Amino acid sequence: MTVTNALRRSIVLRRRPKGEPSAADFEIVEDTIPNPAPGEVLTRTLWLSIDPYMRGRLREEQTYAVAIQIGEVMTGETIGQVMVSGDPRFQAGDFVAGARGWQTHSISKGDQLTKITPGGAPLSAYLGVLGMPGATAYAGVTEICKPKAGETFVVSAASGAVGSVVGQLAKRAGARVVGVAGGADKCLWVQGTLGFDDCVDHRALDLERELRTACPNGIDCYFENVGGAVQQAVFGQLNPFARVAMCGMISQYNEQEFPPGPNLGFVVGKRVLIQGFIVTDRPERFTEWRAMAEPLVAEGSLAYREDVLDGLENAPDALAGILGGRNFGKLLIRVAHEAG
């Protein structure tokens, strides 16, 4: 089977953003949908994940991942549906996950795709609670934080795709969980739906005092997603032998120059463990997490929330929104609907 006279829309990097990215930093281009060669698979993108790490890929310098080049399709995790397959492992109509980027259609090698058989969760969940964000939470909590019953566990960006799972896992371990989120509505959801013991609004006039009130016995575990003032408030209240999982620093992703770091002298005296991690260093965690989490989602005991925008053209504004904390839950772009 071949595809003819059909167009693919892609969003490519037009220029490197200075500060918060905008639609002007990207360009929508069209070309003819290519036909897959033997061993390749043509997919139609249904869902696109928008994640904070994308901002780092827009910088010229390389970090833990290769920078996106000018004119290159923007990166991103996707859920797609197979249109044409030259790989016997996939059939037309199959649902697949992959990092196929900001485009309506893509050609992939079979090894770049993972087949998804949705059960008790919608397809979109495989980009959030059952995907990379969920696996990130699982790895950081189980490998670094290792919460124990009765300990105080704090997570920043608590209403986000990662933070919401982090807190629920810590609660399952018996910890007292305090979230930090932006706004009363997010804190209400964190406590009322996710079951956190308390939540602090990071916009509070005296964040350090509010956090101290929520954590009267100090902080034993901290899952870091934000940095900045939140980190400063938490670090001053860490207990001896506290563990800190450094997952992200979203407050400074748009900065042209990173601000100076905190004075870490207390780490020695309090014997604090601070460890950065990247979930893609642990590919086995994705399989473990999905097997563990799918039944929890199906039975409703692992809660999540999605913030959905329709249309690929909204991806640049969505990226700016997540970096500014304007999303509420896992941010997704619905690129197309499933074929019947």
What name fits each language-model region?
Residues T2-R8, S301-V308, P316-G340:
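C-terminal capping/lid region of NAD(P)-dependent oxidoreductase domains
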Residues T2-V3, R15-L46:
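A short N-terminal beta-strand-loop micro-motif at the entrance of redox/enzyme domains
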Residues I33-I50, L58-W102:
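Glycine-rich beta-strand-centered segment in the early N-terminal region that forms part
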Residues R89-F90, P147, L238:
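Short, well-ordered loop/turn sites that connect or cap secondary structure elements
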Residues G120-L123, K146-T152, P216-I219:
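Short helix-loop-beta connector
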Residues L127-L205:
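Mid-domain Rossmann-like dinucleotide-binding core that forms the NAD(H)/NADP(H) cofactor-binding site
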Residues Q191, A229-L302, V335-G340:
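Glycine-rich phosphate-binding loop and adjacent beta-alpha segment
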Residues D206-N217:
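Short amphipathic alpha-helix with an adjacent loop that forms part of the alpha/beta core around
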